Amino acid sequence: MASHLGGLRDAPVVRVESLVRSFGPRTILDGLSLDIEKGEFVALLGRSGSGKSTLLRALADLDDKVSGSGRLETPDKKSVVFQDARLLPWKRVLENVVLGLDLPDAAERGRAALEEVGLNGRETAWPVELSGGEQQRVALARSLVRDPDLLLADEPFGALDALTRLRMHDLLRQLCARHQPAVLLVTHDVDEAVTLADRVLVLDKGAIAADIAIDIPKPRDHGHRRFGEIRSELLRHLGVETRPVLPV
């Protein structure tokens, strides 16, 4: 069961110790431990079936039907962004952003969040009128309007075209720098992980196989020598061997 951290200023926003999650006889997470600090951006890589989404669902309190054990502490204020923006098609954009937000200034907060993601003026649009990238901007606004201490993102840009993904990377980096939530991004994209994260984890057979700090200033240049070194190291942990590029 997850417990919730209450106001310990120096405590990590997320603390996981010896976490086990199983589906029937199959163990998905096997004694996993992890801390995430306030304002820290952590990316999680792993092959299909390694337990990435299971960990995210555990942190989001969405796995109550899964058997398991271990210590799991998360903040009360958390938001989740999925690959599918999950907007309600019968509600307009602003209504989607403030859905469930029971505050007297909810509409004002929602408009401010939409302005942050570059969608001011689209408050009354229907979701079907938006592009895929715009729908994900709405999903980000919906998450950030709640001022979360923890932002969980499960392949949020996986369905977007390459150019839109790059724009969303810049937007997410700026928003996280401004709001300072702890972030866990689940992704299959090694370059995306190295571009955005302060730290990249590789999950293998339900345990953390690698924990690599990204010691490159932001915004990051993919042509930076260190970027290539970290990419190669992560790919090796994922079972992909790379060869150095030979000079022409």
Swiss-Prot record:
It is an enzyme of class 7 (translocase). It is a peripheral membrane protein. GO terms for molecular function: ATP binding; ATP hydrolysis activity. ATP binds at G46, R47, S48, G49, S50, G51, K52, S53. Keywords: ATP-binding, Cell inner membrane, Cell membrane, Membrane, Nucleotide-binding, Plasmid, Translocase, Transport. GO terms for cellular component: plasma membrane. Its EC number is 7.6.2.14. Coiled coil: none annotated. It catalyses: ATP + H2O + aliphatic sulfonate-[sulfonate-binding protein]Side 1 = ADP + phosphate + aliphatic sulfonateSide 2 + [sulfonate-binding protein]Side 1. It comes from the Bacteria. SUPFAM superfamilies: P-loop containing nucleoside triphosphate hydrolases. It is found in: Cell inner membrane. Belongs to the ABC transporter superfamily. Aliphatic sulfonates importer (TC 3.A.1.17.2) family. The complex is composed of two ATP-binding proteins (SsuB), two transmembrane proteins (SsuC) and a solute-binding protein (SsuA). This is Aliphatic sulfonates import ATP-binding protein SsuB 2. It comes from Mesorhizobium japonicum (strain LMG 29417 / CECT 9101 / MAFF 303099) (Mesorhizobium loti (strain MAFF 303099)).
